[in-house]
Amino acid sequence: MIERFISEVPRRIWGEKAPHRSRFGEAEFNVASWIRFEHSRGPLKLMIHHEDEAGEHLEVVDSTGAPGDGNALLSGVVRVRFTGKVKAMRVLLGVSDPEVIWSVDELYVQRRGTPVARENKLISGF
């Protein structure tokens, strides 16, 4: 699977659940993205990637077979476990073929359990 960068997730979204005094932390995130694709020959995967003191981690949010040309809404809830200081969190698209042409129409990331407010979620129209 080839990983393609979609977006950084701002610290204001994941930072509250990152460990402070304890060494470990955990949080769940609602993630959704509307993806357009052309020339796909295999699956597409929406993924959350984060880096912490234990290394790099990758969680699959959702996937689709995605043959040919079209679009797909990929969405789900992902649980992220943090170890020590968190460096970054990103949204990635996994593609099986380097020839796939893709674009993101919309992206949504929100930590579960937070009040509905603009500062608590990443909503992007590309």
Question: Language-model features: where?
Answer:
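Extracellular and organelle-lumenal recognition/adhesion modules and their flexible linkers in secreted
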Residues: 1-126
